[in-house]
A protein has these predicted regions:
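Intrinsically disordered, low-complexity regions
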Residues: 5-7, 117
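Structural preference for beta-strand elements that scaffold enzyme active sites
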Residues: 7-11, 27-28
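Distinct, well-ordered alpha-helical segments
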Residues: 1-3
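Structured C-terminal cap/extension of enzyme domains
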Residues: 16-118
Length: 118
């Protein structure tokens, strides 16, 4: 199946749906995950485009805990927190954004470590 039919390019905007959107004819991603795992996000797409759908799917599944943690609070709070945890210097929050709940921050830190980016 193909979405867009060559008239419009479709990009996945949900990190938990990269492979399904590509399978429907999507051409790429607009991704929160790519801020903390750019190489891995690129590889998910590249494997798919190279015909390694199973490998792409497995990488997508491997990223699911991190994807879920990156959206456990209002965006962009988790991704900014993740970047700060990674030493990327994303800075302090400005109103109306605030720090993550402690339990969610611990969940995010664990997901980053488990995924190998922290």
């Amino acid at each position: 199946a193909a979405i867009g039919q060559g008239v419009v390019d479709i990009y996945s905007g949900n990190d938990d749906q990269i492979v399904p959107i590509l399978a429907l004819g999507g051409v790429g991603v607009i991704s929160v995950l790519s801020n903390v795992a750019p190489t891995q996000t690129h590889e998910i797409c590249q494997k798919f485009f190279d015909g390694d759908v199973a490998g792409s799917r497995q990488m997508q599944l491997d990223a699911m805990d991190l994807c879920n943690a990156l959206f456990c609070e209002v965006n962009p709070i988790p991704v900014k927190t993740a970047l700060n945890m990674m030493g990327m210097g994303a800075g302090a929050f400005r109103m109306p954004l605030c720090e993550m709940e402690e339990a969610n921050a611990k969940r995010l830190e664990k997901a980053l470590k488990d995924y190998g980016v922290l």
